[in-house]
Amino acid sequence: MMRTVATTVFVESAADPRLADYRALTDVELRRRAEPAEGIFIAEGELVLRRALKAGYPARSALTSERWLPPIAVLLANADVPLFVGSEELLEQITGFHVHRGALAAMARLPLPAASELLPSSGRVVVLENVNSHTNVGAIFRCAAGLGMDAVLLSPSCADPLYRRSVRVSMGEVFAIPYARFGAWPAGLHELTDAGFRVLALTPDATATPLDALKIADDDKLALLLGAEGSGLSGLVLAAAQPVRIPMSGGVDSLNVAAAAAVACYALRRPG
């Protein structure tokens, strides 16, 4: 018989060893952890948790306050994991911040595919080089998922898409689109060209081809390269790709990388 609510465990001490996954979750502390090696990430809020579970990520446990207990208990009814419940003050003491989105859940990571596994079935991919802002990574994943991209590929130094802030900014869309991390960069560019992709490098350079003037064949496979805020794409990457730009006006030369990703993904979407 399926359960209708999760098994709840009331906690009263921030030192409870069962809560180790939730201690010191501020962004500064998270950056000090080898979180990918530990094999977990934190899903924050009912919506993000729901999307993570739907995508097949297994929950290890969850932490919530009594105010949010009813919906979270129903959501985790069949997860067979403890749902820890404490006061809002205790949750803040444990995590280091005010938990205002209802709940946190410690989730097990899934094995990442190799880029070469994603490319054959993809027609549109976003490639990020050295984008180390979790906020920008999360926003770009949301753009990519919502604007018809098939996958996101990351250079080795890009921020982790499953960090708490990335997941939150993406509204859980990091779970909706496949992604992979190149083992070597910029050598990974060869994987794109070998798979038949036309590689486009987004740049504010005035000599680049405007996106609205770009000629795209119906059967073109496109890889959109985006660089970090400020520094942009490296010279090696720009030299190996076709430079494209967003036409700008009003004396503004460029957009934030997440905003630029949204414009470019829309411009490069499949016809129809």
Describe each PLM feature range.
Residues M1-P70, C158-A159:
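Boundary-proximal intrinsically disordered activation/regulatory segments immediately upstream
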Residues A6, L110-T207:
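RNA substrate-binding interface of SAM-dependent RNA methyltransferases
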Residues T8-A15, P82-S87, P178-A187:
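Short acidic-hydrophobic, aromatic-tinged amphipathic segments that line or gate anion-handling sites
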Residues V11, F41, E129-N130, S155-P156, ...:
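Glycine- and other small-residue-rich loops at beta-strand/loop junctions that grip anionic moieties
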Residues P70-D80, L236-V237:
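Short, aromatic/basic amphipathic alpha-helical patches
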Residues L76-A103:
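Glycine/small-residue-rich loop that forms an oxyanion/phosphate-binding "nest" at active or ligand-binding sites
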Residues A103-A106, C143-L147, P161-V174, G235-G272:
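Structured adenosyl-cofactor binding patch, chiefly the S-adenosyl-L-methionine
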Residues L200-V252:
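Active-site/ligand-binding-proximal alpha/beta "capping" segment
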